[in-house]
Amino acid sequence: MTNEERNNLIMSKLSIYLNDYSDYINESMINNIKNEFGFTTLESYKIILTSILDITDKEIIHEFDKIVYELDKSVYEDNLYYKNINLKCISSNKWKFEYKSYKPYEAFVFNDLRCINDKLYPSIGYFKDEYKYPCVLENDREWMLITPNEIETMKVPISEATGNVLTYGLGLGYYAYMVSMKDNVESVTIVEKDKEIINLFNEYILPQFKNKSKIKIINDDAFNYFKKD
């Protein structure tokens, strides 16, 4: 099997599973494997998942060690934004806050796709217990989430931020908040074209920032601002 064929096989099967069956695996299934074979929870999970995906190639099955991860929800619940920013206050005719959740053992993408020696490795995670994450709805449709994927994929940009930071797009202000908490960041300029999002942020979220004085918001299109700058 070529690497391209391998990549297509893994990506296509996982895509279907994540879209349609992400919460199929449950604690009872895990315990059956653990009790019968003495495997760990993670080992049992990977056995069940590769069986559901009908993957029989032993080399690919072994590679799921680099694809599937058991996550510790306390790591994400200890995140500064998660702990300190209360989104429950958001409420209007258009905007509404609520908690969504991942069920125990529900599979989801928690980090970026990796490529090693021309082989693609998705980052699939699960929690052993229910994990709740904040979600803001716009006209009853999901607008912005703060999930483990958001937290993980922002780690490097946040760690590299220093001095006077410029970022395009406001969202729920996760990136802006996290970099504003750094001592080596002097200011955070955010370019956002949607005035309603800016108003939402200024009314409900910015007042909760410890270092709100570092924040400057420019109401403009990112491409227009880049050209002017």
Question: Residue spans of the language-model regions?
Answer:
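Active-site and NAD+-binding cores of ADP-ribose-processing enzymes
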Residues: K119-S123, K155, I215
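Conserved SAM-binding loop of SAM-dependent methyltransferases across substrates and taxa
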Residues: L172-N184
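Structural motif
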Residues: V165, D183-E186
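S-adenosyl-L-methionine
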Residues: D194-D229
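Conserved SAM-binding motif I beta-strand of class I
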Residues: S187-E192
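Conserved class I S-adenosyl-L-methionine
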Residues: E160-G173
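Class I SAM-dependent methyltransferase Rossmann-like catalytic core
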Residues: T2-N7, Y69-K73, D78, P134-E160
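N-terminal auxiliary segments of SAM/dcSAM-dependent transferases
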Residues: M1-F127
